[in-house]
């Protein structure tokens, strides 16, 4: 979503929220939480407050009037009823064939509520230096996580990675072959953004940064001499990320056309730009997702930018056998999340042995 549109939607949600949610928003903005995260949380709060009103757990006529005492006195049984509502309500819609919200969506909703309750019961201070209330009912609500072994997850992901020679082959395909299948009109659009699109794909494959980190890159954050970029990690921590050398040519080619092609002025700080009616804007996450999906589907299989992150991590582990190095590259504080890549690489090694 374009940044300007995202901020507009955030303001729309803020306009209907209770004062304590606005306090929460301001506090998390200072952490800083990303605007995308805060937008998703505000959507979840609206879903929750709508349910409170529908379930007659508040007498407030509108969301903004729901007071703190309502949240303070909700019981574990109330929250379990909300979870049941999330699981079952879509099936009550006769026009829908869905059986209910996915467990992932439900977990996201509960995570947003847990964050709000933690703020209200632990983090915020009133005039006496105390939190607004002390009873955190969310601590009593358990979440169900999807059960899947690392081996199973590795097998599912492996088919969507561009390992070995496929990394450069994918870039080469976009650079030299993709255009051949296009109509003359489509070729014009492709050529306008070719250098930029290749630079984005190359950066994702060469650094393993998250989509949000790539979107938020500014010109000042990119050092092509050192092949290092500065990003804001989850939790607001600034980090320096090494970029593999194969991306340098693609990034340089994009920079050579960036100003002229996208009408960029001094005030246009974003590294990756799009242009509409002569006005440059930061390229948004949705556009990059669609772009990566389009090219990857034509090359082999449709993937997300996150799979390009997995690709880099797997290739790096295969080359170094160091989970510590991989976790540092990805911006993780623990090596536990990199266990997945050992399984993928071990499977690849087994397949290689079987082919001897």
Swiss-Prot record:
| InterPro entries documented for this protein | CB (IPR044068), DNA_brk_join_enz (IPR011010), Integrase-like_cat_sf (IPR013762), Integrase_catalytic (IPR002104), Integrase_recombinase_N (IPR010998), Integrase_SAM-like_N (IPR004107), Recomb_XerS (IPR023670), Tyrosine_recombinase_XerCD (IPR050090)
Identify one Pfam family in the record. Answer: Phage_integrase
Places the protein is found: Cytoplasm
Q: How is its activity regulated?
A: FtsK is required for recombination.
Q: Where is the Core-binding (CB) domain?
A: 16-121
Q: Name one GO cellular component term.
A: cytoplasm
Keywords recorded for this protein, A-Z: Cell cycle, Cell division, Chromosome partition, Cytoplasm, DNA integration, DNA recombination, DNA-binding
Q: Name one GO molecular function term.
A: tyrosine-based site-specific recombinase activity
Q: What is the active site of this protein?
A: 210, 234, 306, 309, 332, 341 (o-(3'-phospho-dna)-tyrosine intermediate)
Q: Which Gene Ontology BP terms does the record give?
A: cell division; chromosome segregation; DNA recombination
Tyr recombinase domain location is 169-354
Q: Which family does it belong to?
A: Belongs to the 'phage' integrase family. XerS subfamily.
| Family matches, as HAMAP family | Recomb_XerS
**Listed PANTHER family:** PHAGE INTEGRASE-RELATED (PTHR30349), TYROSINE RECOMBINASE XERC (PTHR30349:SF77)
Q: What does this protein do?
A: Site-specific tyrosine recombinase, which acts by catalyzing the cutting and rejoining of the recombining DNA molecules. Essential to convert dimers of the bacterial chromosome into monomers to permit their segregation at cell division.
What is the protein name stated in its UniProt record? Tyrosine recombinase XerS
Native species: Streptococcus pyogenes serotype M1
Q: What is the lineage of its organism?
A: Bacteria, Bacillati, Bacillota, Bacilli, Lactobacillales
Q: Report which gene this protein is encoded by.
A: xerS
């Amino acid at each position: 979503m374009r940044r300007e549109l995202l901020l507009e939607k955030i303001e729309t949600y803020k306009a209907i929220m209770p004062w304590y949610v606005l306090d929460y928003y301001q506090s998390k903005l200072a952490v800083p939480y990303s605007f995308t995260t805060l937008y998703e949380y505000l959507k979840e709060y609206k879903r929750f407050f709508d349910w409170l009103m529908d379930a007659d757990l508040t007498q407030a006529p509108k969301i903004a009037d729901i007071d703190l005492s309502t949240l303070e006195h909700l019981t574990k049984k109330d929250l379990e009823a909300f979870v049941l509502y999330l699981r079952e309500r879509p099936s009550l819609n006769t026009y829908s064939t869905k059986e209910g919200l996915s467990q992932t969506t439900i977990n996201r909703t509960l995570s947003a509520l847990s964050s709000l309750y933690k703020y209200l019961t632990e983090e915020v201070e009133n005039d006496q230096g105390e939190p607004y209330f002390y009873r955190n009912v969310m601590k009593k609500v358990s979440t169900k996580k999807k059960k899947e072994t690392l081996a199973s997850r590795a097998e599912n992901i492996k088919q969507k990675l561009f390992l070995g020679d496929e990394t450069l082959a994918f870039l080469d395909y976009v650079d030299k072959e993709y255009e051949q299948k296009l109509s003359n009109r489509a070729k014009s659009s492709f050529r306008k953004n070719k250098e930029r699109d290749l630079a984005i794909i190359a950066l994702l494959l060469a650094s393993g940064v998250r989509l949000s980190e790539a979107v938020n890159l500014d010109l000042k954050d990119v050092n092509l001499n050192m092949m290092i970029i500065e990003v804001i990690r989850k939790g607001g921590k600034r980090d320096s990320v090494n970029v593999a050398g194969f991306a340098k040519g693609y990034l340089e080619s994009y920079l050579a056309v960036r100003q002229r092609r996208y009408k960029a002025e001094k005030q246009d700080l974003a590294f990756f730009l799009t242009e509409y009616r002569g006005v440059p804007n930061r390229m948004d996450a949705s556009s990059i997702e669609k772009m990566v999906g389009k090219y990857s589907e034509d090359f082999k299989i449709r993937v997300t930018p996150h799979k390009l992150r997995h690709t880099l991590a797997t290739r790096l582990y295969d080359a170094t056998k160091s989970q510590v190095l991989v976790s540092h590259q990805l911006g993780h504080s623990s090596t536990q999340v990199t266990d997945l890549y050992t399984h993928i690489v071990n499977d690849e090694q087994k397949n290689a042995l079987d082919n001897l």
